Swiss-Prot record:
One of its GO terms (biological process) is formaldehyde catabolic process. The keyword Zinc applies. This is S-(hydroxymethyl)glutathione dehydrogenase. Its EC number is 1.1.1.284, 1.1.1.1, 1.1.1.-. The gene is FLD1. The lineage of its organism: Eukaryota, Fungi, Dikarya, Ascomycota, Saccharomycotina. It is an enzyme of class 1 (oxidoreductase). It comes from Komagataella pastoris (Yeast).
Amino acid sequence: MSTEGQIIKCKAAVAWEAGKDLSIEEIEVLPPRAHEVRVKVEFTGVCHTDAYTLSGADAEGSFPVVFGHEGAGVVESVGEGVESVKVGDSVVLLYTPECRECKFCLSGKTNLCGKIRATQGKGLLPDGTSRFRCKGKDLFHYMGCSSFSQYTVVADISVVKVQDEAPKDKTCLLGCGVTTGYGAAINTAKISKGDKIGVFGAGCIGLSVIQGAVSKGASEIIVIDINDSKKAWADQFGATKFVNPTTLPEGTNIVDYLIDITDGGFDYTFDCTGNVQVMRNALESCHKGWGESIIIGVAAAGKEISTRPFQLVTGRVWRGCAFGGIKGRTQMPSLVQDYLDGKIKVDEFITHRHDLDNINKAFHDMHAGNCIRAVITMH
C-alpha cells in the first residue's frame, strides 16, 4: 500500500533536551513538499558530532530534535519538482548539500553549498518549517538529515542516488566519517607518493585519513593518539608508527619529538580530534617551508586556535576541510563504486551494531573509547 502523500507514523530516537539519553518515540513524518524527498532510512551510523550536539556544547543545537546524519535508505516519495531521485532509489543522505547553482557550488573552489545553510543551521527545512511532529510538538531536523528516524524528509539537494547493490549498512558510513577523512587526504591535501603524514586522533576519521594516505603512496604515516588501544587499529589501516604523547619520557615536547623523528617535520598533518591544543601541535610539527595542516575535527563552541605568526610566515599552511572536500551529489557514486571494487575499506570501521531501540548503547560505546563506528538497524 502506497504511503505517498500521507503522514507516516514511525519510530524515531528523539532528543528532548541536551545531556539526556535519546527517547524512542512514535512520531509523525509529514509528506515532502516541493523539492523535498521522503526517505525510508534503513541504516544509520552514530557519529561524535551527534554526541557533541546532544551534550549541549553546540551553539547551533536546538531541541527537541531528531539527530543522525550518516544515513542510507530508499526513496519513499518525492515532492513537486524533484528530478534527481525517484521512488525506490537507493540513496545516501548528505549533510553537505550540493545545489550546483549557488556562488559556492559554481566557484570550483569548494564543496560547501550556501543554498540552504541558513535554515539547515536552524534545524529546519528550506521553507523554514519542520516535517516531524511528536506529542503535539514540532521536532527540529539535524544537519539536513535526521537519520535517527525510520522515515525522514530532506531537501532534494541533500540526497544522492547510489548503486542498488551497495549494502546500506556500509554506504551510510560514506555519509560522513569515512568520506570525511579519506577525502581530506586525497582531495584537500592531495597527498603525493613519498609524503610524510601525521594523523592526530585515530578514530573513524583518523583511520580514514590513513587509508587515503596509503592509497596515495605516503612513505611515513605516523599516528598520534593518547589511547594505546588505537595502535592496533592504526596498524591495520596502514600506519607506519604510533606515538602516545603521554608515554614519552618526562619533559619531552611532542612537537620537537615529531620534528626530530621525521627529519624536519611532516609534509601534511591532520587534526581529527577537535582539540585546539592538538591543532596547534599538528601545525607546528609540519615541515618548515611547505608543511600543511588540515583541521577536520570540530572544536567546542567558543574555542579558538592560536600559534605564533612566524609559523605561517615560514611557510606552514593551516587549512580546514568539511566532508573531505567531496561534492556529495557529484562524487558519492564513484566513492561507493570504489568501495564495491575493494579500493576503500568501510566494513572494517564497524565495531558495534544495535537496533533503534538500543541506540543509546551506541553513544555509551562511543564514550567508552573502544568503538570506531556503531551502525543502527532502523527497521
